[in-house]
From Swiss-Prot:
Keyword Zinc attributed: no
Basic and acidic residues composition-biased segments: 89-98
Native species: Methanosphaerula palustris (strain ATCC BAA-1556 / DSM 19958 / E1-9c)
Keywords for this protein: Ribonucleoprotein, Ribosomal protein
Gene3D superfamilies assigned: 3.30.70.330
Segments forming a coiled coil: none
GO BP terms, alphabetized: translation
Assigned GO CC terms: ribonucleoprotein complex; ribosome
Region named Disordered: 76-98
Listed name of the protein: Small ribosomal subunit protein eS24
Gene this protein is translated from: rps24e
UniProt xrefs under InterPro entries: Nucleotide-bd_a/b_plait_sf, Ribosomal_eS24, Ribosomal_uL23/eL15/eS24_sf
Family: Belongs to the eukaryotic ribosomal protein eS24 family.
Length: 98
């Protein structure tokens, strides 16, 4: 996996960085969890502060375009982001059988 950051802007009002990137990969499309982990390792940030918003692949390309937000604090992330984006890419919780 190779990352190329195409845009890195700072949003002071919401206390976050907004990154647009291009990911080049071999084989199957990587999962959101793999992408988030790799980007966090490269930028030396905590995974709890990151939200992957969109990942777009093109037909026949081994490349995807993505958009992610990196928050300054966990509270800012919880306050600003929609709940489905926070849960996206996480394993579903098993319902208890009664």
């Amino acid at each position: 996996m190779e990352f190329e950051i195409t845009s890195d802007t700072r949003n002071e009002l919401l206390g976050r960085r907004e990154l647009r990137f291009i990911l080049t990969y071999d084989g199957a499309t990587p999962s959101r969890k793999e992408i988030r982990g790799k980007l966090c390792a490269l930028n030396n940030i905590n995974e709890n502060l990151v939200v992957l918003d969109s990942l777009r692949t093109g037909y026949g390309r081994m490349q995807l375009d993505g958009f992610m937000r990196i928050y300054d604090t966990e509270e800012g992330r919880q306050r600003t982001e929609r709940s489905y984006l926070l849960n996206r890419g996480e394993p579903k919780k098993e319902e208890e059988e009664a």
